[in-house]
Amino acid sequence: MERIELIKKLSNAEGISGFEDNVLEIIKNEISDIYNVEKDSMNNLYINNILKENRKKPLVMLEAHSDEVGFMVQSIEANGLLKFIPIGGWSSSQVQAHKVKVLTNDGKYIKGIISSTPVHFLKGDGKMELKDMFVDIGVFSYDEAKEKGIEVGSPIVPDVECEFLSEQNLFLGKAFDDRIGCAIITEVMKDIKNDLDNLEVEVTGVLSSQEEVGLRGAIVSSQKVCPDLAIVLEAPPADDTFRNKFSSQGGLKKGVQIRHIDPTMIANPKFVKFIKDVAKKYNIKYQETVRESGGTNAGKIHLENLGIPTVVLGVPTRYAHSHHGFVSLDDYESTLELVKKLLKELNENIIKNF
């Protein structure tokens, strides 16, 4: 039950790129009593960061990003509608008529709806670009919007409450990309606390900011931690609703996804083989993917410190970068278990041979 509640809390938290504080507070409350936790000016959060000169063993960085896709107020119109820009990648077809929350200048959120044209007034194909949409917060003038505390630069997040569907063992909610990764790191760091002395590696957990707008936080966090090895935890888009069982590489309930390549990184082949061997040893279900598009913080991390062996492990997410998605608790638990087993199996000689 604790696991389910943690995932729900993280999914519900408001945290577009640059405004990740609510997410970080949840994680700090979960873990700050057992680890040293620190935050930098980029809003990256570090759990158990160990200075290089104090390390006795190779350091493995577990990394996820804390931000979610959303929007930001660009201007307030005379009639009180809010002009906005996207923060992160959105398809205009998945945005209209959805509920959102807008952060006011006193730290509260007020509800709104992204504008749409009723079917009665549609002309042509009815398609509308993001640049032509507005957020309606139920006011009728510029002054009313200002009185509500709306400002240029106010962040906007999807207004969605996460649910756990126990019969299907699925979560339905927003921002699983990448609150799922945040939850895994939180759980792993808790679970290994009493076993750290028996591991042959040091472990630091990192929640990086601003991934959705250009992998920015990870540039700073990987330079600060300077790890010997990195495991990036992600919630990549599932493809099992539109690909057959032979071509699908991101199916729900098919296990942890191991990524070979995407446009930002080719995974270290020896590291990938090691991961697959460990998964087989412990009978952990996994699937493999070769991605033609997308990218993760691994794209920046693997280039730091004269090259860091890095891999991306994912929990596939249906309908990523939209208001609502599904993730499987089974896949989450496969990923969690694999990360813990990797930490158990890794040692200095293995890492040197990657």
Each model region followed by its residue ranges:
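N-terminal hydrophobic/helix-forming segments and targeting peptides
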Residues: 1-354
